Amino acid sequence: MRALVALSALALIATVAMAQDSGPKGISASAIKWGPAPGALPKGGQLAGLSGDPGKSGTFTIRLKMPAGYKIPAHKHPHVERITVISGEFHFGTGDKLDEKGASKLGPGGFVELPANTNHYAFTKVATVVQISGDGPFGIAYVNAADDPSKKN
């Protein structure tokens, strides 16, 4: 639940910034406002809300900036997750444990759609930015509770 609240709070920034009217909404790359990723994600990541609110019903789009060596242990989401690689290399796989040898790699422009409740993991070897779209309310549940960064001090 804390992960949902943290993602929702971040998306509020984007919603307020882009909800000036009901017309087309655009934002240049240089205007994207980055902040620390919520506690449900490993430290070192940065998140930017582009549209919608992941904590509420409806569609949303966020970006996640990850440094080289960033690892997100096996987890799942209650809804479909759609990921597009903006820059760098995004490594991902399905299963109950992070498996670097069994992972697939996507470069800029690459796309993956992960079905709801599918255990998966991700990692980077170089600095990487991905765009994540989905339907809320969005959340994250780690396969191994000990991997959940929000539960660590």
Tell me what each language-model feature is.
Residues M1-L4:
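Positively charged n-region of N-terminal signal peptides that target proteins for export
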Residues A6-T15:
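Bacterial N-terminal signal peptides
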Residues G23-I27, K101, Y121-N153:
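Double-stranded beta-helix
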Residues P67-Y70, K76-K97:
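Glycine- and acidic-residue-biased ligand/ion/polar-headgroup-sensing regions
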Residues I72-A74, F92-G93, L114, N119-K125:
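Short beta-strand His + acidic residue motifs that chelate non-heme Fe in jelly-roll/DSBH
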Residues L41, P54-T59, P73-T84:
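His-enriched metal-coordination microenvironments in redox/metal-binding proteins
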Residues D53-G55, P67, F90, D96-N117:
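Short acidic-glycine-tyrosine-enriched beta hairpin
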Residues M18-F60, A145-N153:
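A short, N-terminal "cap"/entry segment at the start of jelly-roll beta-barrel domains
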